[in-house]
A protein has these predicted regions:
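Surface-exposed, secretory/extracytoplasmic low-complexity segments enriched in Ser/Thr/Asn/Gly/Pro
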Residues: 1-205
């Protein structure tokens, strides 16, 4: 019983997790999962559950919650989101470092919930493009030329998101194009980003 209580404390003692979206061919979207952060009185729970077991009866043990942090998107809230407003895809070749940067950036915005009246910032959501965060050196566009730099490829994610937001009818509040045309989106449909300098942002109006 003690090990079970410790396992529960360990599971719920982790940072909260948002409900995960699943997209379907008919244009609908469903969510599942999601978990809050909970800190509870382990000794009190163990004593209460132990008493129930020692009495040979069935029942529910009381849990004294000491601290709680809900995820940004709970499963209950997610059920209100059931339609895909817009989507967009871009293609990329085989480049290990660039592919890794795209993966990290895409994962950092996956499941982000922008409620009505709220705004989204790409730079805030993806965080620092640094080696500490897993980003690798890959080609980036500087003054119209490809140069090696940490985080090359993240602009493809911001461009893909920009087009999805645009097709969804969301208000684009910050967006800048690259110095020169890029291969993965039509001219005028790209969104470059530079940490601390250029951001892509939209508002859910």
């Amino acid at each position: 019983l003690g090990n079970k209580v410790k396992a529960l404390a360990s599971e719920y003692g982790k940072p909260p997790v948002n409900a995960e979206p699943s997209f379907h061919g008919d244009g609908s979207v469903t969510f599942s999962g999601g978990r809050p952060y909970l800190k509870f009185d382990e000794k009190a729970l163990l004593a209460d559950a132990g008493m129930i077991l020692s009495n040979g009866t069935s029942g529910k043990a009381d849990v004294s919650v000491l601290d709680e942090k809900k995820p940004d998107l709970t499963e209950k809230e997610a059920k209100e989101v059931n339609v895909v407003l817009g989507w967009y895809t871009t293609e990329f070749g085989i480049d290990g470092s660039r592919d890794k940067n795209i993966e990290i950036a895409a994962k950092s915005i996956k499941g982000v919930y922008v409620k009505p009246g709220e705004s989204f910032s790409y730079n805030q959501s993806t965080g620092a493009r640094s080696k500490e965060n897993g980003y690798q050196e890959a080609p980036v566009i500087i003054n119209g030329k490809l140069e090696p730099g940490i985080g090359g490829g993240v602009c493809q994610v911001s461009t893909t998101l920009f087009n999805a937001a645009l097709l969804s009818g969301l208000e684009i509040t910050q967006r800048a194009n690259h110095y020169s045309p890029i291969h993965y989106a039509p001219i005028g449909r790209d969104a470059t980003v530079a940490e601390g300098i250029i951001d892509f942002a939209f508002h859910n109006d």
